[in-house]
Amino acid sequence: GTYVCPQEYSPEHGPVEDGMPHAQQLVWELFDNTLKAVDILGAKTCGIQAEELKQIRRCYEKIDRGLAVEVYDGAWGEEVNGVRKGDKILREWKYSPYTAGENGHRHISHAMCLYPFNQIMNDPELFEAMTNTLKLRGDASTGWSMGWKINLWARALDGDHAHDILELALRHHDGDGINYHGGGGINFNLYDSHPPFQIDGNFGATAGIAEMLVQSHNGEIHILPALPSVWTSGKAEGFKAIGDFEVSIVWDEMKASYIEIENRQGQPCI
């Protein structure tokens, strides 16, 4: 058997169940980061006793990772946003089918494994299931949700799709009240509109732009990994990569013509 979190849910969406993928991904990431810290710093520096470390490792090996697929059976149409009946999607609930939720819901909590975590990039089946999940959810949503989706599509290496959502996120919205089902954009002062105002959308959109230009995960720095085709030339300076590397890029005709990587901590860089 595996260890699962009891009585969890996919935030603001659907039923309560044990072993919710969102919670499992969070817990697995916590254990994984803890063990990586121990490998780098040593258990003593981390304040972990030998027996505690053994227990952490035992639990880590048995944690349900919250990464499973199901098949889209056409309940919302034979084809929705390019997802066809029979295509695989990532499970949002461990036991309930995707139809337990709302098509087009603003939250995509089981997508944490793609961004901000990096748990499925090296698994083609899960990666494809995740992109199908994003397609099925749709693009237009609340302001903060579109900010997250920009990052998700950038991490999925689809710069044009990320740019399409960026354009939606930058459309003008002028109105009162609260809309949980769409209508997001920006106000004249450039504050993100859920609606109402939520700073998450501003931070998310700018993070998404950075994610299109520079990514760092799995010990690697990726230059222009999700460059939109409309950004044929440009310049970006001072981007931070994991490990305290500072990256600057100039590109022309969709190709980098100048790359500068400053190693701020003297760490290995290949």
What are these regions (language model features)?
Residues 8, 53-61, 224-231:
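A glycine-rich phosphate-binding loop feature that marks nucleotide/adenosyl-phosphate handling sites
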Residues 244-269:
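Carbohydrate-binding surface patches
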Residues 1-22:
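Aromatic- and carboxylate-enriched substrate-binding clefts and catalytic-loop regions
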Residues 2, 18, 104-106, 213-214, ...:
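A general structural signal for short secondary-structure junctions and capping/turn motifs
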Residues 186-187, 217-248:
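Glycan-recognition and catalytic regions of carbohydrate-active enzymes
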Residues 11-14, 158-159, 172, 230-232, ...:
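Flexible loop/turn segments at secondary-structure boundaries
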Residues 20-220:
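Active-site core of glycosidic bond-cleaving carbohydrate-active enzymes
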Residues 3-5, 221-223, 255-263:
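Short, well-ordered strand-loop elements centered on a beta-strand within folded domains, enriched
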